[in-house]
Amino acid sequence: MATRFRQTRRRRGHVSMGYGRIGKHRKQRGGRGNAGGQHHRKTWFTTFHPDYFGKHGMRVFHLKANKYYCPSINVDSLWSLVGKDVQEQYKNAKTGEEVPVIDCVKHGYFKVLGKGFLPKQPVIVRARYFSEKAQQKIKAVGGACELTA
């Protein structure tokens, strides 16, 4: 809408001419933007943005999880995963009958090693890896080795 007078004519009599009373139409004496956050605007920053400054820890983006993580268990410790009552329950089981299943991965072990001896009792062992001796000893008592992912 066209007006008859310019703004300067219309604002005569108003002290600040529309530019406010604090800066009075001068440049940024407090700095631009977030300047002075630790100096003359410290109270404002500590009140409304308390964690703006300082260290906040880090994300270790270059560190990979251990790809060689492979906890192992020996053949002589396999029965300790299931307990004595299970061993007694399947004591007289033959190769064709129902035999206990020992899931090593469920108990936190990925690899079965061949140290020690197994009781002469068939058993199915599930793991991600088996050493050759462990496979031989498990099969010698009539058991089986199952690879899991």
From Swiss-Prot:
Which keywords does UniProt give here? Cytoplasm, Endoplasmic reticulum, Ribonucleoprotein, Ribosomal protein
Q: Which InterPro entries match?
A: Ribosomal_uL15, Ribosomal_uL15/eL18, Ribosomal_uL15/eL18_sf, Ribosomal_uL15_CS
| GO CC annotation, single | cytosolic large ribosomal subunit
PROSITE patterns in alphabetical order = RIBOSOMAL_L15
Keyword Endoplasmic reticulum among UniProt keywords: yes
Q: What GO molecular function annotations does the UniProt record carry, in alphabetical order?
A: structural constituent of ribosome
* Annotated compartments: Cytoplasm, Cytosol; Cytoplasm; Endoplasmic reticulum
Stored Pfam families: Ribosomal_L27A (PF00828)
Which Gene3D superfamilies would you find in this protein's record? 3.100.10.10
Principal localization reads: cytoplasm
Which residue ranges are recorded for the region named Disordered?
A: 21-40
Q: Which pairs of positions does the record mark as disulfide bonds? A: none
GO BP = translation
Has UniProt tagged this entry with the keyword Cell inner membrane?
no
Q: How is the quaternary structure described?
A: Component of the large ribosomal subunit.
The function of this protein is: Component of the large ribosomal subunit. The ribosome is a large ribonucleoprotein complex responsible for the synthesis of proteins in the cell.
What family is reported? Belongs to the universal ribosomal protein uL15 family.
- What is the recorded name of this protein? Large ribosomal subunit protein uL15C
Q: What is the lineage of its organism?
A: Eukaryota, Amoebozoa, Evosea, Archamoebae, Mastigamoebida
